[in-house]
């Protein structure tokens, strides 16, 4: 996925009210742009740090742009726009990059399902049945480690999705939790038990119930982002 028009570089001033970010462009322009991430963004918010944003020319938009990429304290690039994860995964599914899920005949988005009135990110239809795929965007990394972690904040919604997937798996339906790791320099992903122990427990329970747990890494640059490799998932 290439950024078109190209992203613009800026310096982060602050993020506030969850969805607002103040930046200074390389030309000295001060802007308030949209922050498309509801998480804590623990390692993605460095005041004065380098960021990249997409600018909108839509006169109906209240804000002139969207924060897309941040440079972390470890020098990695993180795609902080969580909406990109589903776009990247769909692109990878259609290109056959996620080999475990190849062979589907139809792809449907945001399909209602489950006991708790959820919507699955993707339902893939195969000749012998359907697979339900839940996508999570991962950007949390640590100094001196090539292992990313999810979540970066307590997520009751994420735990609910795991319960829904586990219920499907127990019924013999193929259920998949897919982590889209939008952070460069990563080899594996794990549950962030130190941040949300309940989510970590729900993930292990879902795996025991038969849910497939996959992780794929994204090559992140300021020009292009794309899913390019499978990563290990560490649950022990």
Swiss-Prot record:
It comes from the Bacteria. It comes from Pseudomonas fluorescens (strain SBW25). NCBIfam families: sfsA. GO terms for molecular function: DNA binding. This is Sugar fermentation stimulation protein homolog. InterPro entries: SfsA (IPR005224), SfsA_C (IPR040452), SfsA_N (IPR041465). CDD domains: SfsA-like_bacterial (cd22359). Belongs to the SfsA family.
């Amino acid at each position: 996925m290439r950024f078109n028009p190209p992203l613009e570089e800026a310096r982060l001033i602050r993020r506030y009210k969850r969805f607002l970010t103040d930046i200074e462009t390389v030309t000295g322009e001060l802007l308030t742009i949209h922050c498309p991430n509801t998480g804590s963004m623990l390692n993605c918010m460095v005041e004065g740090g380098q960021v990249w944003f997409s600018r909108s020319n839509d006169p109906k938009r209240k804000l002139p742009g969207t924060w897309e990429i941040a440079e972390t304290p470890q020098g990695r690039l993180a795609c902080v726009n969580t909406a990109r994860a589903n776009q990247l995964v769909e692109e990878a599914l259609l290109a056959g990059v996620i080999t475990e899920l190849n062979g589907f005949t139809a792809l449907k988005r945001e399909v209602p399902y489950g006991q708790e009135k959820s919507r699955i990110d993707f339902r893939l239809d195969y000749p012998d049945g359907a697979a339900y795929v839940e996508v999570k965007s991962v950007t949390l990394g640590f100094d001196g480690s090539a292992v990313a972690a999810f979540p970066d904040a307590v997520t009751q919604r994420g735990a609910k999705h795991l319960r829904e997937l586990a219920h499907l798996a127990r019924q013999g339906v193929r259920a998949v939790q897919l982590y889209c790791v939008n952070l460069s320099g990563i080899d594996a992903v794990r549950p962030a038990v130190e941040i949300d122990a309940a989510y970590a427990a729900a993930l292990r329970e879902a795996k025991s119930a038969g849910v497939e747990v996959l992780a794929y890494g994204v090559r992140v640059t300021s020009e292009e982002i794309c899913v390019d490799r499978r990563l290990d998932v560490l649950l022990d």
